[in-house]
Regions:
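Beta-strand elements of repeat-based all-beta scaffolds
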Residues: 1-56, 60-257
């Protein structure tokens, strides 16, 4: 599209793609886009086609770095704040995700965006500068035929969430329960049951662990995965029932209690 302004003609709402030596664009890789207002965004890519720099119309930019599996290991925003992701030796399981507490210096930016950057080594040396979430995994044999199940996640405050999974049946490989701990103290538990469509049909949440009290909710769905009926039992046996209706675009149109 073209727009004329002050006697000048500009192309807007336009995308430019990269091409190989034969002049072909095989992988739908953009190098530049111009929006309807004429703002231009540019994209730099590595040898594998991953976007490593995005330059905005105002000259600010974001940076990214990738591992050998083409998974993002570094993202640096326009202000210099970084998110670092450390994977296992295979480059597939996320072990740590860290967000910088302060903008990085240019030296650190150069370090984290360099080829062959090692997030594990870097985070070990710079833990104090990041808020870090870490993950532990079950052995691949824990649930037959399903690998990569997270056993526990520790947030930046040190709170630990432990996960258990269904080993067979309808919900095989889906989360059976979550347990939140503060140190060795159980703070909260949530357990799940699933229907034949693998949607959560029942959710049981601890209300008062010391008194063994739990609140229960049950759910029904339509064929578009919208929740149509919610039964909230609280800690009792009589539910408060809520019914929801949706239009053909899955927008909620009515709710009755």
């Amino acid at each position: 599209n073209t727009v004329e302004t002050d006697g000048q003609t500009y192309e807007v709402d336009k995308i430019t793609y990269s091409t190989d030596e034969d002049g072909e664009n095989k992988y739908d890789e953009m190098i530049e886009s111009v929006d309807i207002m004429g703002n231009t965004t540019k994209y730099d890519r590595d040898a594998n086609g991953n976007v490593i720099k995005t330059t905005n119309a105002d000259g600010t930019y974001t940076l990214a770095n990738y591992n050998s599996k083409n998974s993002v290991v570094v993202e640096v925003d326009e202000l210099g704040y970084a998110t670092i992701k450390a994977y296992d030796s295979n480059g597939t399981r996320l072990l740590k995700e860290a967000t910088s507490l302060h903008p990085l210096s240019q030296t650190d930016i150069n370090t984290v965006t360099a080829d062959n950057f090692d997030p594990v080594t870097y985070l070990a040396a710079n833990e104090a500068s990041y808020a870090i979430t870490s993950h532990e995994y079950y052995a691949d044999s824990y649930v037959s035929g399903i690998a990569g199940l997270i056993r526990a996640t520790t947030d930046p405050e040190g709170n630990v969430t432990e996960y258990d999974y269904y080993k067979d049946g309808v919900g095989k490989g889906l989360v059976k329960s979550k347990t939140l701990k503060d140190g060795n103290t159980v703070v909260n538990t949530v357990s799940y049951e699933y229907n034949a469509q693998l949607q959560v049909s029942k959710e049981t949440t601890s209300f008062d662990i010391s008194k063994n009290l739990y609140s229960v909710k049950e759910y029904e769905y339509d064929k578009f995965n919208n929740v149509t009926v919610t039964r909230d039992y609280g800690t009792g046996s009589t539910p408060a029932t809520t019914v929801a209706e949706y239009d053909l675009l899955s927008r909620k149109t009515a709710e009755y209690a």
